[in-house]
C-alpha cells in the first residue's frame, strides 16, 4: 500500500511541474513589465556576479550572507535582473507559505487541513512577508530551512535526511543572526536524541561550502567578518530603511533581553524539542538581538502560531487571535520592535500556567 501511495504522490509531483514552470514564467514576465527590482535582490545578484568573476562579494556591496549563498544564486544571476526579480518573488512567497505549512505539521496546530492552508496563505500575505518581497530579502528561505531542520530532528519517522539537511544547512545560514539560537537547540536535540545524521551532514555541508568558497575567493572569511563588524547594515548608504531603533535604544537593559532565551534553554532541557520549546527559542532569540529589521520578523510567525494554539487550548477562544493580530498590525506601526517580547510573553504565560496546572493535577 505504501509503495502505491508513494508512486501516486510522485506522479502528482511530476504533473505539478508544468504548473510550477508556468508560475515562474508569469512571475518573470510580471517583474519585467512592472520594472520590479528589489534593492536587496540587486545586491544579492551583484554579489553572485562578483564571486563568479573571482572578486569579493563584500567590498562595496551590501551583502552580509556567507559566500555560499552567492554561489547558490549564480544561476539566477545569469538572468536579466528584470526576470530574476520575479522568480525570486515567487520563490520567497512559496517559501513563506511552505514554512508555515510545515510548522503546522510540527506543532499540530491547527488540526484542520483547510485551516492549515488558510493560515499559511495568511502568513505569506502578511505585512512582514510583504516587506520581504519588496526588499528582495532571503528571510523566507532561511525560515523554511529552520523549520525543515526542526521537522527532520523532531519527527522520528523521518528517514531520508541527506538531501533535505544539505539544502537546509546552506539556506539557514543565509540569515545567521536571526536563526542562531533556535538552530543551536535543534542541533543539540539531534545529538541528545542520538540522531547523528542531521548534525554530521549539517557540519560537513558547511565545511565543504566554506572550502569551495575559499577556492573561489580565498579572502572571504576576513572580508565577511569585517563587513559584519563594520555595522553598515545598521543604516548604511542605500539601505531601504536608514538608521535603527530597537529595544536597547529604547532603554531596555540588555540583561532583561537575555532572560527569554535563558528560559527557553531551560524549557528545552526539561521538555525536549517540542513546538513550545522551539517557539520560545525563536521568539527569545529575536528578543536578544541588537539588530532586527521588519522583514526579519517573518521568522516569528511560527512562535505566534504556537502562542495562538496554546491560548485557544487553555483559555477563551477569542484570545487565540491576539498573537496573530499582533503579527498583522504591529509591523505597520513604529512598534514592530515589541513583537518578539510580546510573543514571548504570551508563550510564557500559557506555558507557565500549563506547567502549574499539570503539577497540581
PLM regions: where:
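Sequence-pattern detector for short linear motifs
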Residues: 14-15, 178, 296, 353, ...
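Membrane-interface alpha helices of multi-pass inner-membrane proteins
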Residues: 161-187, 281-289, 323-329
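Aromatic-enriched
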Residues: 308-361
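Primarily membrane-embedded glycan-assembly and transfer machineries that use lipid-linked glycans
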Residues: 2-156, 160-163, 188-316
Amino acid at each position: 500500500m505504501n509503495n502505491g501511495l508513494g508512486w501516486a504522490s510522485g506522479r502528482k509531483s511530476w504533473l505539478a511541474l508544468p504548473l510550477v514552470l508556468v508560475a515562474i514564467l508569469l512571475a518573470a514576465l510580471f517583474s519585467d513589465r512592472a520594472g520590479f527590482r528589489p534593492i536587496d535582490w540587486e545586491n544579492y545578484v551583484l554579489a553572485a556576479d562578483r564571486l563568479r568573476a573571482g572578486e569579493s562579494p563584500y567590498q562595496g556591496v551590501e551583502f552580509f550572507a556567507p559566500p555560499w549563498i552567492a554561489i547558490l544564486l549564480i544561476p539566477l544571476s545569469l538572468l536579466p535582473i528584470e526576470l530574476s526579480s520575479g522568480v525570486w518573488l515567487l520563490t520567497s512567497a512559496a517559501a513563506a507559505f511552505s514554512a508555515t505549512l510545515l510548522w503546522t505539521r510540527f506543532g499540530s496546530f491547527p488540526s484542520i487541513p483547510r485551516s492549515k492552508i488558510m493560515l499559511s496563505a495568511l502568513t505569506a500575505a502578511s505585512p512582514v512577508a510583504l516587506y520581504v518581497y519588496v526588499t528582495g530579502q532571503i528571510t523566507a528561505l532561511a525560515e523554511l530551512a529552520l523549520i525543515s531542520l526542526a521537522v527532520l530532528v523532531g519527527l522520528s519517522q523521518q528517514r531520508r535526511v541527506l538531501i533535505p539537511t544539505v539544502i537546509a544547512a546552506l539556506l539557514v545560514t543565509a540569515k545567521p543572526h536571526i536563526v542562531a539560537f533556535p538552530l543551536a537547540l535543534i542541533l543539540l536535540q539531534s545529538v541528545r536524541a542520538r540522531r547523528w545524521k542531521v548534525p554530521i551532514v549539517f557540519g560537513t555541508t558547511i565545511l565543504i561550502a566554506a572550502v569551495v568558497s575559499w577556492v573561489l575567493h580565498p579572502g572571504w572569511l576576513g572580508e565577511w567578518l569585517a563587513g559584519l563588524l563594520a555595522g553598515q547594515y545598521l543604516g548604511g548608504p542605500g539601505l531601504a530603511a536608514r538608521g535603527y531603533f530597537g529595544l536597547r535604544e529604547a532603554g531596555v537593559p540588555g540583561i532583561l533581553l537575555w532572560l527569554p532565551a535563558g528560559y527557553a534553554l531551560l524549557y528545552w532541557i526539561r521538555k525536549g524539542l517540542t513546538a513550545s520549546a522551539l517557539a520560545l527559542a525563536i521568539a527569545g532569540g529575536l528578543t536578544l538581538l541588537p539588530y532586527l529589521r521588519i522583514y526579519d520578523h517573518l521568522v516569528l510567525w511560527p512562535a505566534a502560531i504556537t502562542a495562538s494554539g496554546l491560548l485557544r487550548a487553555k483559555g477563551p477562544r477569542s484570545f487565540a487571535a491576539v498573537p496573530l493580530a499582533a503579527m498583522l498590525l504591529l509591523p505597520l506601526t513604529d512598534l514592530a520592535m515589541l513583537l518578539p517580547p510580546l510573543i514571548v510573553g504570551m508563550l510564557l504565560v500559557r506555558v507557565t500556567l500549563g506547567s502549574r496546572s499539570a503539577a497540581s493535577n
